[in-house]
A protein has these predicted regions:
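Peripheral, non-transmembrane regulatory/ligand-interaction domains of membrane transport proteins
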Residues: 1-210, 219, 223-226, 301, ...
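DNA-binding recognition helix and immediately preceding turn/loop
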Residues: 209-216, 234
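Hydrophobic alpha-helical segments, principally membrane-spanning helices and signal/leader peptides
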Residues: 18, 57-58, 86, 175, ...
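Hydrophobic alpha-helical transmembrane segments and their immediately adjacent juxtamembrane loops
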Residues: 225-326
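Alpha-helical heptad-repeat coiled-coil segments that mediate oligomerization/polymerization in large
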Residues: 168, 172, 213, 220, ...
Length: 326
């Protein structure tokens, strides 16, 4: 979709025909927004700007020169915007081109709250957005505000996770999955905020932007630095939560091993006694012990062996309790 924002009377032309650009000049347009453009729309904008638009591969490159570069007739900047996907979010690359005449071109493939909010600001106070430079900075401002909301959202999720771990008796694999998911989201969020920090730093060093923009850039960089610190804190807290969760899992596993170990030790003396009296020797006097009472013969050897096994097991249990191992 091709959307054109005209300078005169803040007029917006949505779903514009590409041929419309043939009748317009740089003085007529502030902003050209391309949302999942057709080949015809893309070629029309390239012809109007006399500049090739960035491919998705170029936008996704991680080199610093691919994020911000100044050319003879234009400025090119590539960044990533977050797109909500249920409980998580994905990263969608966005490309910007600003001509020396102050015309902004944005290229994206996903609908974004950032652009809708920037459009509202443009319509409410279009006199404050005299050039595409101002619109570009406004887009970054809105994006930073939304990034702050995401950082706060992740921080709340981390706090909820920490509370759940402290109140639950057992830790299952779902908790570990939640920790890993939050770590991944926090890491991606921090990387993209850092990406915006680099873009703002490059703009601050540039001499092409209007002078009234630079004070705003100083405030934006401070906000970005604060967001990076908050994201770092959330990531460090997740590391602590992960260590705590793994520690609790180890304690649970040790308790299970302890039960089996204690059971084995308790029955070890009884097993030894049974093994001794189970040996097939000819001379084992205890086996022939008997006691005759009222015509009945009681096998004392058998009772002696059973009693000895019970006594040894009981003494072992008492010893463990005395040592507070049970």
């Amino acid at each position: 979709m091709l959307t054109i924002y005209l300078k005169q009377y803040n007029k917006i032309i949505r779903n514009a025909e590409p041929e419309l650009l043939d009748n317009l000049g740089y003085d007529d347009i502030q902003w050209i927004d391309l949302l999942s453009p057709t080949i015809k729309e893309q070629k029309a904008v390239e012809a109007f700007m006399e500049e090739s638009l960035q491919t998705r591969q170029q936008v996704e490159e991680i080199e610093s020169t691919s994020k911000y570069s100044e050319r003879e007739n234009s400025i090119i900047s590539n960044t990533n915007f977050f797109v909500p996907r249920g409980d998580s979010f994905s990263v969608e690359p966005v490309s910007f081109i600003i001509s020396n005449e102050g015309v902004l071109v944005s290229l994206r493939n996903e609908e974004s709250r950032t652009f809708r909010e920037a459009e509202k600001r443009l319509q409410m106070n279009y006199r404050s957005f005299s050039t595409g430079y101002h619109i570009f900075i406004s887009l970054l401002e809105v994006r930073i505000d939304f990034d702050a909301d995401l950082v706060e959202f992740v921080a709340k999720q981390v706090a909820t996770l920490s509370k759940d771990i402290n109140t639950e008796d057992t830790i299952d694999k779902d908790v570990i999955h939640r920790i890993n998911s939050l770590q991944e989201n926090t890491m991606v969020l921090r990387e993209n905020i850092f990406d915006r920090q680099r873009i703002l730093s490059n703009i601050l060093r540039s001499e092409r932007f209007p002078n009234d923009i630079y004070p705003r850039l100083q405030l934006m960089i401070k906000d970005v630095n604060s967001l990076i610190n908050h994201a770092d804190f959330s990531f460090q807290r997740l590391d602590y939560i992960q260590d705590s969760a793994l520690g609790l899992i180890n304690i649970e596993q040790n308790e299970i091993v302890k039960i089996f170990s204690v059971a084995a030790v308790i029955f070890l003396p009884a097993t030894l006694i049974a093994s001794v009296y189970g040996m097939n020797f000819d001379v084992m006097p205890e086996l022939s012990w008997t006691w005759c009472v009222g015509g009945y013969t009681i096998p004392l050897g058998y009772l002696f062996a059973i009693g000895l096994m019970i006594l040894c097991s009981g003494l072992t249990i008492w010893f463990f309790r005395y040592k507070k191992w049970l």
